[in-house]
């Protein structure tokens, strides 16, 4: 499903992926980041003791409705989030997905050698 989502988003420019057409529909860029935040928060952090959060600010920006995890950006205002840039979200997404898949394929064993936030562009 993740590959299909990325394929659908690929022809869109970064500006296209920023648009929030109505308050109840989140931007494409936000959806890509939210999935990565979900993997990081609920799969990687609880299961990999050496895992480091990619960016502490992303929890607020990309949490959808998990109030027990912390505060969040209002849904109607997600289109106002211009940073991080799409390139950084794409890199973070690839790294988080790689780590999640590696962890699942290895039965929960750590694969952190492939994951390093410094490999992604900064905003």
Model segments located where?
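Alpha-helical bundle segments that constitute or directly flank the non-heme di-iron/ferroxidase center
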Residues: 1-11, 33, 37, 91-94
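Alpha-helical scaffold segments that form or flank carboxylate-/histidine-based iron centers
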Residues: 17-37, 80-89, 110-123
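Acidic/histidine-rich alpha-helical segments that form the ligand environment
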Residues: 64-111, 118-121
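Helix-loop segments that flank and shape redox-cofactor active sites
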Residues: 3-27, 45-53, 102-115
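Conserved alpha-helical segments that form or flank metal/cofactor-binding pockets of metalloenzymes
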Residues: 28-71
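Solvent-exposed, flexible loop/coil residues
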Residues: 16, 21, 47-48, 58, ...
């Amino acid at each position: 499903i993740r590959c299909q989502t990325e394929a659908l988003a690929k022809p869109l420019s970064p500006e296209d992926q920023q648009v929030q057409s109505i308050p109840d529909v989140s931007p494409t860029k936000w959806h890509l980041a939210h999935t990565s935040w979900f993997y990081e928060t609920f799969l990687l952090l609880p299961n990999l003791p050496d895992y480091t959060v990619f960016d502490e600010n992303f929890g607020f920006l990309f949490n959808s409705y998990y109030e027990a995890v912390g505060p969040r950006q209002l849904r109607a205002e997600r289109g106002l989030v211009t940073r991080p840039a799409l390139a950084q979200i794409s890199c973070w997404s690839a790294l988080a997905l790689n780590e999640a898949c590696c962890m699942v394929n290895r039965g929960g064993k750590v694969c952190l050698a492939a994951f390093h936030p410094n490999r992604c562009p900064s905003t």
